[in-house]
Amino acid sequence: MTEYEKMLSGEIYNAVDPSLLKDLYACSELCWEYNQIRPTDFKARNEKLKQILGEADDDTFINPPFHCDYGKHIKVGRRFFANFNFVVLDEAPVTIGDDVFIGPNVGIYTACHSTDPKERNTREEWAKPV
């Protein structure tokens, strides 16, 4: 089983596995691009969100800055709105329904790690869906 498969299945996985880091960095680039789009260019913003998110509609709206780890594990329903500084650590699936409005400075975190420093330094994590 790959580290990616372990991550999605809720098993302990190596968070610094090169294949995972490649996907993380690719999503970071997409988020950076999204956050640089002019505030009134709604079409470009929506197109970029559709590249980032696993599922999004034409009426999906997120005020930048927006950050997520993988993006492809995030599914949002119709008429979704998130205000400034929305952060999603989507190591596991994140499913958000229709007509959801999220306030500023909200984070959704699926990733977990040990609180013991020695265990945490192994870079092992697990993730649970939200």
Predicted regions and their residues:
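Terminal amphipathic alpha-helical/low-complexity segments used for targeting or macromolecular assembly
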Residues: 1-59
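Flexible, glycine/small-residue-enriched loop-and-beta-strand segment within the central core
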Residues: 66-76, 81-130
